[in-house]
Swiss-Prot record:
The lineage of its organism: Bacteria, Pseudomonadati, Pseudomonadota, Betaproteobacteria, Burkholderiales. CDD domains: KOW_RPL26 (cd06089). It comes from Paraburkholderia phytofirmans (strain DSM 17436 / LMG 22146 / PsJN) (Burkholderia phytofirmans). Part of the 50S ribosomal subunit. This is Large ribosomal subunit protein uL24. Keywords: Ribonucleoprotein, Ribosomal protein, RNA-binding, rRNA-binding. One of its GO terms (cellular component) is ribonucleoprotein complex. GO terms for molecular function: rRNA binding; structural constituent of ribosome. GO terms for biological process: translation.
């Protein structure tokens, strides 16, 4: 069970974008892509077959999953824990103890 999932609101805790918030767009193997964070400029060649023009595009690149933390109701970074209730695993915030939706 992943502690951070698609759609979670996270805050960057280290790196050049420290303190910025965003929504997780996708989760990969040890990496997350967060909307509007870790933007880099990529040069793109024009391709008339696909109908794309060339130029410089801003692209969102993945971040290490350890460099982001979930945002709690108070707007602060919080670690995530997993507890077992019966036969189900439930994520919860360690700062407030609030359970997160499945």
């Amino acid at each position: 069970m992943n502690k951070i999932r698609k759609g979670d609101e996270v805050i960057v805790i280290t790196g050049k974008d420290k303190g910025k918030r965003g929504v997780v767009l996708s989760v990969g193997e040890g990496k997350v892509i967060v909307e509007g964070i870790n933007l880099v400029k990529k040069h793109v060649k024009p391709n008339p077959m696909k109908g794309t023009t060339g130029g410089v595009e801003a692209k969102t690149m993945p971040l290490q999953i350890s460099n982001v933390a979930l945002v709690d109701a108070n707007g602060k970074a919080s670690r995530v824990g997993i507890k077992v209730e019966g036969d189900k695993k439930v994520r919860f915030l360690k700062t407030t103890g609030a359970e997160l939706s499945a």
